[in-house]
Amino acid sequence: MKLYKVPIKPISQFATKLKGDTLFGQICWAIFYKFGKEKLANLLEKYRDNRPFLVVSDAFAMGYLPKPKMPSCFLKEKSEDKKMNRKKIWLTLEELLNGAYTQAKTDKEIKNGDKEDITIHNALNYKTFHTGDGFDPHGLSVSKLDKKDIFFLLDEEQLKFDEFKDVLELLSDMGYGKKASVGKGRFEFDKDEIEEIKLNSNSKVFMTLSPFSPKGLNLKNIYYEPFTRFGKFGANRAYKNAFKKPILLADVASVIEFDKVKEYQYLGHAISGLSDIPEYSDTVHQGYSIVLPLKDLV
């Protein structure tokens, strides 16, 4: 499998966070629309059998990756600087691979321009063009995002590189996440700026680039923050019962330690059984994550 970095430029507000597992689901729908149901079904059949055609990372500040979520003693951080260290969350790829965790920077230092806001909405009766008796205002959290990097681990024997680019282009036009039908979640990317990242994948310690399921792994240690995904069906499946069963995952930047040196490009497994609706039994969730090799923990 080949690891690619895709720089994107958001061109509208986003109402859903750019998380790898959600991105994967949206890409599956783009494959469905671009290449048909049979193509997607064949890809997902192998995906369930620990042969993922694609693993997608979260979106990160351009040129940076998240600091590993592990105890400060492994990060060589001073306990008296605990408050400041919590804000230092970004490392370059080189710093991360070399274990230079004390070089981590804050959003302000890297000039990350992400901004989150709440927009207030109200239900409108389109017959009367009034709000009605209930007066039910609600807030929608939206984000204005700076340029991002997203990593994709692609098996080109299953999904060709040109097919992947076409699918990503379709997704960028369709929009990502909540409220895409009214213009949210749009982004641009230049196909010529897609970069292949070549790494030595041998290590005892790895860091994840998206939420994943560590179930079944023979680990020495794992350091993580829990993340509960309350998923919803989208596109053609959003109308019967949109809600999926909750999934407990280890969030992005989890650190996995093994007893011996291993070679991994990704860890985790596909997650099924997300709905009791029989015709939705083929649904799978990305429980895989791209992993990067770290220095041994001392």
Model-inferred region functions:
Residues 1-298:
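Conserved active-site/ligand-binding neighborhood in enzyme cores
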